[in-house]
Amino acid sequence: MRGPIVLHICLAFCSLLLFSVATQCLAFPKIERRREIAHVHAEKGQSDKMNTDDLENSSVTSKQTPQLVVSEDPMMMSAVPSATSLNKAFSINKETQPGQAGLMQTERPGVSTPTESGVPSAEEVFGSSQPERISPESGLAKAMLTIAITATPSLTVDEKEELLTSTNFQPIVEEITETTKGFLKYMDNQSFATESQEGVGLGHSPSSYVNTKEMLTTNPKTEKFEADTDHRTTSFPGAESTAGSEPGSLTPDKEKPSQMTADNTQAAATKQPLETSEYTLSVEPETDSLLGAPEVTVSVSTAVPAASALSDEWDDTKLESVSRIRTPKLGDNEETQVRTEMSQTAQVSHEGMEGGQPWTEAAQVALGLPEGETHTGTALLIAHGNERSPAFTDQSSFTPTSLMEDMKVSIVNLLQSTGDFTESTKENDALFFLETTVSVSVYESEADQLLGNTMKDIITQEMTTAVQEPDATLSMVTQEQVATLELIRDSGKTEEEKEDPSPVSDVPGVTQLSRRWEPLATTISTTVVPLSFEVTPTVEEQMDTVTGPNEEFTPVLGSPVTPPGIMVGEPSISPALPALEASSERRTVVPSITRVNTAASYGLDQLESEEGQEDEDEEDEEDEDEEEEDEEEDEEDKDADSLDEGLDGDTELPGFTLPGITSQEPGLEEGNMDLLEGATYQVPDALEWEQQNQGLVRSWMEKLKDKAGYMSGMLVPVGVGIAGALFILGALYSIKVMNRRRRNGFKRHKRKQREFNSMQDRVMLLADSSEDEF
């Protein structure tokens, strides 16, 4: 039984991967450009705030591989369980040329300036252009990894200028497994919409990290980065930076599978998952680094370390917006629900860990980001739900997604993934405090920052048009960021996919970025779902409050705010995770996790029905084509038959014309019959005979061919059958004969023996008798 089951599982998995890749490829082209633009805008807005956020975030970065690059500031890449660099990745290589595969810059002081911080990571990873350059799969995977790495450097806040160089990151990317590649692809599209969009680099890399969890993608580099992650222990204000201390926790996440130095990077990741998220945000500001275009590091692939953290459940609980983002990219619910997967993984990995906390950190980071930096980061996270690998989830989010001009919240979503990382998350519970509560009406996102201050951004969600042109794309300040969300349609689907928040991850609420879009309330679903990128109203399900470590819970987000027409799921609050780290701060982060199941203004039903109709239409068309072909064949057969009949009729002495008579038709007038009586038939000339004969021969040949073809087709099987039967009969008969002979021979032998014995007996008797006589 085991063999068949394993085979089926393998086949299903392979088909899933192929399907996801295909869908991503289809979806990328349209969405890519908008996202890039959105990313750039978001990054610009964020860069201002970046410094503070970066500082906060820097504490954790060290452990994660991504962190390698950015030891401290790198938004605690390490925190991300698998190649936490995800978040870091956002800061796309500011300096690195898009063409270059990051890594160019070993080290980036970028920390000092907000923009700079984002850059280092980007450079290290590689220009956003890299994704384009890379083959779809490999390129994506690389892009993701690199991005994640980039994010770290950028995360390294100004204060944490120490962030290490990320030169190592590139190799990681290469190692990404195929699955990661697929996810990365998606990320690439979203994060690095185009080479030119380098700035936008957006850390899809987080998703790649998630992958690492699955595929170790980032591992090679992670090992290199271990040291960095270690030293970056900086803790957020509320959270303990135990970046180095908890290597193990991350590994549970799925980091282990990743080659990354499981312990170091993982530990860092676990401890700094939240931080990583924050850093991610800070990275976002690095819009300019690469092309001078905003890098929109916002990308912040929150999914980052918690490769699985972004699972749909997570998104629901953590990031409403993320969940929105997470559209079923592959149409596969599980996959589409990036959150669920991520959260699942996160939960599994962290179980006891603060699975949710990393998210909170991310949320904080989001808040920390400059206003209007909201960022699609969260959306990106989800995008990769399909991949399922934690890294992937990260990937999904991309800057453009963020609706709110300044929603730090969106970053929070991205961070959500990080939250998945176990222990780090705990530490980062404090990070949770950032309550990215965005009420639909108010669009206010409150997040307590790591420092413990609460940042409230009232987001005027003017992005009524989620589908705005890329130009309007999410300039951070411009709330039109929604533009990037032209994907809106699919978003509806994503929302549907949103699953109940995973109770396991406490962070859900935190990560949950409340994202409100006025009109559509469409959440940007940046899910990897290549085909359908829809922005579903993130607003509806967005509200989630994250409590800062030092602050009391702010249940503000506790009750999900639902925009009109949006259904909200009951919020579930997960108990604060025990602080794995003995962090002094009370990180009773009890992000109230609200799961909102909101159907985009386009009802999910509508989307589904539309898709269903399309499928039906396609099927109908195929059926019609088949029927037409059958009809054509039938017509041809009929034509051939009629021809044959005509030929047969003609061949029976057709048309010899009698003298003076033009018509051979039977309906001749009686008047002409008299003429016919005395008429003598003329033998047709040679030409006529030839034509007639040819017609006869042709018809006969066709008939023969038809029958002979049928017969010839039957001859082989019939002949083989007969031969087989004869052979079997012959074998049986031969066996019978052989047995008979043997039997006869045996009998003969016995008879002879008997006779011989009797003769011997006689001789002996004679001898005895003779002796007696003597």
UniProtKB/Swiss-Prot annotation:
Q: Which GO terms describe its cellular component?
A: membrane
- In which residue ranges is the amino acid composition biased (Polar residues)? 258-275
Q: Which residues are glycosylated?
A: N57, N189
**Where is this protein localized, as stated in its record?**
Membrane
Q: In which tissues is it expressed?
A: Expressed in podocytes.
Which residue windows are transmembrane per the record?
715-735
> Does Protease appear among the keywords?
no
What topology does it adopt in the membrane? Single-pass type I membrane protein
Q: Which residues lie toward the Extracellular compartment?
A: 28-714
Q: Which residues lie on this side of the membrane: Cytoplasmic?
A: 736-774
Q: What InterPro entries would the database entry show?
A: ARMH4
Return one GO MF term: TORC2 complex binding
Signal peptide bounds: 1-27
Q: Which UniProt keywords apply?
A: Glycoprotein, Membrane, Phosphoprotein, Signal, Transmembrane, Transmembrane helix
Q: Name one GO biological process term.
A: regulation of TORC2 signaling
Q: Where is the composition biased (Acidic residues)?
A: 607-651
Name of the protein in question: Armadillo-like helical domain-containing protein 4
This protein's species is Homo sapiens
